Swiss-Prot record:
Pathway: Membrane lipid metabolism; glycerophospholipid metabolism. Its main location: cytoplasm. It is found in: Cytoplasm. Its cofactor is Zn(2+). Keywords: Cytoplasm, Lipid biosynthesis, Lipid metabolism, Metal-binding, NAD, NADP, Oxidoreductase, Phospholipid biosynthesis, Phospholipid metabolism, Zinc. Zn(2+) binds at D147, H225, H246. This is Glycerol-1-phosphate dehydrogenase [NAD(P)+].
Length: 334
């Protein structure tokens, strides 16, 4: 069964409508999962800080919800992911109240606390207060663009899986995911960005819904996400001091993967330029240096990305470091 949000509110002062939405859903006693910086957006409900919750014990995490009829996640990625997980394990409805817009986790059924990610259910309601979101750090909002443009290469990878491995594919989910990305890119390339936070939130929610439709992360996560996960591995392996975000890494990864598709004749030059220029338009990174990684690290990440997850992508069985360097140079990432 496909579960998508019953209520989606994306507007100024939307957080003031949380009690109304709870009432509409006949929910009386929610538990709020939030952070110390976002606690101020919680009104009148019991809460717990996300970093006080032990997430490794998946079976007992449901006990946090035993005295409540619903879970609300207020904040960025981690409070919302933990809220989704508790709601899933306790079989209680989940409401997502994002305070920034850096990835599609605000609406998707995916929990990314571990690798591989964990499938739950999409939120029953999403309440996105634009007054709050537009005040979040610009770096987070530009990271959201990186997460959205990655839909283009993710869907190409999914289509490749269908062709080369007879993988199940959803036309409606794939088309929806690509259209969301194209519309946001078109907006940032042809406007003054005044409405960017609202447009971004709408796109991220749409991306999350495309995942719910497919019941898979495929429409929004492909080889560019494997590249991002590889960079995370490099950070730990070499103790790299960088503040690069998931969405930023996915954006750069999208350019690298798009270059491969370009060389195979499966992506137009105009599309590649649109991807790159839309990232630049919101000041998202497009080079290794802007991400905070040395050339050799980026090369190692791209050449090893295929090993991070058993998922068929354009990387197939992997590429050599020499080929990775060539791709990264041609796409001007290094």
């Amino acid at each position: 069964m496909i579960v998508i949000p019953r209520y989606t509110i994306i507007k100024e002062k939307a957080s003031g409508r949380i009690p109304e939405i709870l009432d509409n859903l006949n929910l009386k006693n929610p538990l709020v999962i939030t952070g110390k910086n976002t606690k101020k957006y919680n009104k009148d409900f019991d809460f717990i800080y996300y970093d006080e919750i032990e997430t490794s014990d998946l079976e007992n995490i449901k006990n946090y919800a035993k005295d409540y009829d619903s879970i609300i996640g207020i904040g960025g990625g981690r409070p919302i992911d933990i809220g989704k997980l508790i709601a899933h394990k306790s079989k209680k409805p989940f409401l997502s109240v994002p305070t920034t817009a850096s990835n599609d986790g605000i609406a998707s059924p995916i929990v990314s606390l571990t690798q591989p990610s964990y499938m739950t259910e999409a939120p029953i309601a999403i309440i996105a207060d634009i007054d709050i979101i537009k005040k979040s750090p610009k770096k987070l909002l530009s990271a959201g663009m990186g997460d959205i443009v990655s839909n283009i290469t993710a869907v190409l990878d999914w289509e490749l899986g269908k062709i080369e491995k007879s993988e199940k594919y959803s036309d409606s989910s794939g088309i929806f995911s690509k259209t969301i990305a194209i519309e946001l890119m078109d907006y940032v390339l042809n406007s003054n960005l005044e409405e960017y936070p609202k447009k971004l939130v709408k796109a991220l929610i749409g991306s999350g819904i495309s995942i719910a439709i497919a019941h898979s992360s495929r429409p929004a996560s492909g080889s560019e996400h494997l590249f991002s996960h590889a960079l995370d591995t490099m950070k730990e392996k070499y103790d790299i001091d960088t503040t690069s975000l998931h969405g930023e890494q996915c954006g750069v990864g999208t350019l690298a993967i798009a270059q491969i598709y370009l060389e195979e004749g499966k992506l137009e030059v105009e599309t590649f330029e649109m991807l790159k220029n839309s990232l630049k338009a919101v000041d998202a990174p497009v080079t290794a240096e802007q991400l905070g990684f040395d050339e050799e690290i980026i090369i190692e990440a791209l050449s090893s990305a295929n090993t991070l997850r058993k998922r068929h992508t354009i990387l197939r069985n992997g590429i050599s470091k020499e080929k990775a360097r060539e791709i990264l140079e041609k796409s001007e990432i290094i």
